[in-house]
Amino acid sequence: MPTINQLLRKKRIKPVARNKVPALQKQPLKRGVCVKVYTTTPKKPNSALRKVARVRLSNGFEVTAYIGGEGHNLQEHSVVLIRGGRVKDLPGVRYHILRGNLDTQGVANRKKRRSLYGTKKGK
């Protein structure tokens, strides 16, 4: 524990909280255009082909965003909405694409948790 004199000489340093989603610039959502839509493989114990897209945002940032749900209709030049939220087993993927918004269709035949996947209520 430092003495009062030591604290007068050098103040306690506060930990700097780094921004986990810098490209959003403190906004909840951001619009962007898909530059490239592709699949990639996750980190080590997992195995799959995860669907991701490289998106150029309206503020000039270019980020990699995850496309959740089964199947999608995205291709190059699709206009999408992204939100924050990383994918734990994909390094560098810190954003999610919102389903059922702009050019992105909702997940077909989805019955549960539909609001997360932009699916309309089935009859």
Swiss-Prot record:
CDD domains: Ribosomal_S12
Pfam families in UniProt: Ribosom_S12_S23
Cross-referenced InterPro entries: NA-bd_OB-fold (IPR012340), Ribosomal_uS12 (IPR006032), Ribosomal_uS12_bac (IPR005679)
One of the protein's GO biological processes: translation
Keywords: Methylation, Ribonucleoprotein, Ribosomal protein, RNA-binding, rRNA-binding, tRNA-binding
The UniProt record lists the keyword tRNA-binding: yes
Post-translational modification 3-methylthioaspartic acid, affected residues: D89
SUPFAM superfamilies according to UniProt: Nucleic acid-binding proteins
UniProt superkingdom: Bacteria
Membrane spanning stretches: none
GO cellular component: small ribosomal subunit
GO molecular function: rRNA binding; structural constituent of ribosome; tRNA binding
Keyword Ribonucleoprotein recorded: yes
Family membership: Belongs to the universal ribosomal protein uS12 family.
Subunit text: Part of the 30S ribosomal subunit. Contacts proteins S8 and S17. May interact with IF1 in the 30S initiation complex.
Function: With S4 and S5 plays an important role in translational accuracy.
Name recorded for this polypeptide: Small ribosomal subunit protein uS12
Organism from which the protein derives: Pelagibacter ubique (strain HTCC1062)
